[in-house]
Amino acid sequence: MCLVALLGACSKPLHVGTLQLGSRLNGDNTIATHTTRFKPDDKIYAAVLTADTGSSTIAARWTYNGQMVSEEERRVSFKGAGATAFEFKSASGFPIGEYKVEILVDGNPVASREFRVE
């Protein structure tokens, strides 16, 4: 039990409402151009939308043909709805194939989306 919980200072973990994929972001970190099909030189973004107040570590784990190729995490805190964006990067372009992004909140998998580079 969190001692400061008695004083109302502990915050609950965030709940992921939606996971968006696309090639362009809006100013509020939501996806402007939704897609699950990309070209090798496209930018690839995942936007994690939360609808409640809370604080958590959100991670994006990117895989290609079943092998993890990138992972990034951020500590975030929101008072109400929020969006956290992650960019999947490749300096030389993405190989053609099947990909997946998995979202973890405080180390626990909560959402995933498959996508394709063609």
Q: Where are the language model's segments positioned?
A:
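Short beta-strand edge segments in extracellular beta-sheet folds
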Residues: 75-77, 115-118
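Solvent-exposed serine/threonine-rich low-complexity stretches and specific carbohydrate-binding patches
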Residues: 69-79
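Aromatic sugar-binding surface patches on proteins
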Residues: 78-88
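Short, exposed beta-strand-loop hairpins at the edges of beta-sheets
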Residues: 91-117
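Conserved aromatic beta-strand anchor motif in extracellular beta-sandwich/beta-rich domains
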Residues: 60-66, 103
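Short, compositionally biased P/S/T/A/G/V-rich stretches that sit at domain boundaries
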Residues: 11-40
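C-terminal motif of bacterial Sec signal peptides marking the signal peptidase cleavage site
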Residues: 6-9
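Short edge beta-strand/loop segments characteristic of extracellular beta-sandwich folds
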Residues: 43-51
